[in-house]
Design a protein with these regions (language model features):
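N-terminal lobe/hinge region of extracytoplasmic solute-binding protein
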Residues: 31-81, 198
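Extracytoplasmic/peripheral linker and loop segments enriched in polar/acidic and small residues
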Residues: 313, 402-411, 435-498, 517
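Structural transition elements
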Residues: 317-364, 381-382
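Aromatic- and charge-enriched surface segment that lines or borders ligand/interaction sites
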Residues: 76-126, 293-295
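Periplasmic-binding protein-like
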Residues: 290-335, 385, 472-481
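Ligand-site clamp/hinge motif
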Residues: 219-266
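Surface-exposed binding/hinge segments that line
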Residues: 124-182
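Gly/Pro-rich hinge or "lid" segments in bacterial periplasmic/extracellular proteins
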Residues: 159-231, 244
Length: 517
């Protein structure tokens, strides 16, 4: 009997080792060209950094594709009846990639960093409803004053006002942990090298080479991870190479997946698989600066209505998409699909219905002695888009229209002071959150919109899906912002890869569910 038990035990060990070996051998090669400098949750920004970040870290909550939330590092969460206290209970078995336990202090430390102005976290405005957060962000109080409490197994967040969008913050970088001792020991290089990066997600960073001639990164199965996103993959190897020839390398079996330019989509081949996501929303913003011609509603309306949206597809590279909204399609807000029942109404100059407006504007421009107008743009790609509008304005108003290439900050400044009549501005889209896009339009978030009514609606403690949709509509009704087109990013996968998807929050590849034949 003892011999039989020994044989069974031996077979069990062999099968276990065989299974581990099979999993370890499944390493996907994902090629991209963007060099990762930091995978610090509060600093990471380019596509490669975010791909690594969301695979090696796990936030308190996980955003699902339908806009709902599930538990990540949190075992459970609850919101008080008055909607001012958010409580998280942490998973008892959660560990860092070095085997240390994850606790409430780790999430608290990251939140304090997120609102600390010295961190310059791009998503800090989404945390402004937490007690004292605004005062901390304006350097009036210390990060230690942030309205949170914690112990080893929990984190509690106290809000100054009801915030229907606060859960999104905890499904992203602000909801990820940062261990203070590791942060301090890194000496300013936290999450900038393999040795200064520890994480709590299904993968852990195992290689990061930044030397010339070999720029690579690799993350492998985190043996200490026991959460809801356990993976069958052994890891993901990320060689950094220019995009030239990437499709050939994929077809020849040298790589398994990678990013491709929109112009290459049609060449990807039937056997290969494509995933895409919206990465930017490009709008035409219009000046309403006081003491300028653009403060005149009729003049601004005429410029707005004569902006050429019809020729966008002719002006743009293939696979860009004409926008019907400032917010990207399939976005969610307040737990619901954005504009499912109330599509944004955009102006269309059909049958000459705005001829009176154009005539009045032409007279107004003449009376104000306006002899030229300027439209600004950020990139060479955008020039052809603004050229169509410039031609329209010249024909309608009989004045010279210049197109000016400028920096984003100078375009925003020029629209605010009236140096530019309008400017083409691109905003990055963070996954499927409509609210994050609306925040980026606000001047407080570094955006272009100074309209008080819009800002008040976006930051309101009583905001709802309907009130936010109305706020967006007001930008169109006041002729301040006109949706133009969406930028998209594309990922191509060989037929040997299955189960791949994109993280709804970041729009980057989720390798936790992927498998390799």
């Amino acid at each position: 009997m003892k011999k039989l038990l020994c044989v069974i035990a031996a077979l069990s060990i062999i099968l276990t080792l065989s299974s581990c070996k099979e999993s370890d051998s499944k390493v996907i090669t994902y090629e991209t060209e963007a060099l990762p400098d930091s995978v610090d949750p509060l600093i990471a920004s380019n596509d490669t950094e975010l791909t690594i970040l969301y695979n090696i870290f796990e936030p308190l909550l996980l955003l699902e594709s339908d806009g709902s939330f599930s538990c990540g590092a949190a075992e459970s969460y609850s919101l008080s009846d008055d909607k001012l206290t958010l409580s998280f209970t942490l998973r008892k078995d959660a560990k860092w990639s070095d085997g240390e336990a994850v606790n409430g202090a780790d999430f608290a430390f990251n939140l304090k960093r997120a609102v600390d102005p010295s961190t310059r976290f791009a998503g800090s405005t989404a945390l402004s409803s937490i007690k004292n957060a605004k005062a901390i962000m304006s350097s009036e109080q210390s990060p230690e004053a942030l309205g949170i409490s914690y112990d080893d197994g929990s984190l509690t967040v106290y809000l100054e006002r009801e915030d229907s969008e606060i859960l999104y913050a905890f499904a992203g970088p602000a909801g990820m942990p940062c261990r203070e001792d590791s942060f301090d020991a890194a000496g300013g290089k936290y999450c900038m090298t393999k040795d200064t990066t520890i994480s709590n997600g299904p993968f852990a960073l195992s290689r990061w080479v930044k030397s010339q001639g070999e720029e690579t990164a690799k993350f492998i199965n985190n043996k200490y991870y026991s959460g809801p996103r356990a993976t069958n993959l052994g890891g993901v190897y990320i060689p950094l190479k220019k995009a030239d020839g990437r499709l050939d390398r994929l077809k020849n079996g040298n790589i398994d997946c990678g990013t491709i330019d929109s112009s290459e989509v049609s060449s990807a081949g039937e056997k290969n698989q494509l995933l895409s996501d919206y990465c930017s929303s490009v709008v035409m913003a219009f000046s309403s600066a006081e003491n300028t011609a653009f403060a005149d509603d009729t003049i601004r309306k005429a410029l707005y209505f004569s902006t050429d949206r019809d020729n966008i597809q002719n002006a743009l590279p293939q696979f860009y998409e004409k926008a019907g909204d400032i917010v990207s399609p399939d976005s969610v807000c307040c737990g619901k699909l954005w504009r499912k029942d109330s599509p944004l109404t955009l102006p269309e100059n059909t049958d000459g219905q705005f001829s009176d407006v154009f005539s009045s504007a032409k007279t107004g421009l003449s009376e104000k002695k306006v002899t030229s107008l300027s439209i600004a743009y950020e990139t060479d790609e955008q020039k052809s888009v603004v050229n169509y509008t410039a031609q329209n304005w010249q024909k309608l108003f009989g004045i010279r229209v210049d197109t000016v290439k400028s920096t984003r900050s100078q375009i925003i400044k020029g629209i605010k002071d009236g140096s530019f009549a309008a400017g083409l501005i691109s905003f990055n889209i963070d996954g499927s959150s409509a609210y994050s896009t609306l925040l980026k339009l606000c001047a407080e978030g570094g955006g272009i919109v100074t309209d008080e009514g819009y800002t008040e609606a976006v930051y309101s403690s009583n905001k709802t899906l309907e009130s936010l949709e109305a706020a967006e509509s007001s930008l169109v009704e006041k002729c301040l912002v006109l949706p133009m087109y969406y930028g998209k990013k594309y990922y191509v996968f060989s037929s040997d890869v299955s189960g791949q998807s994109l993280f709804p929050y970041s729009g980057t590849v989720d390798f936790t569910k992927a498998d390799l034949l």
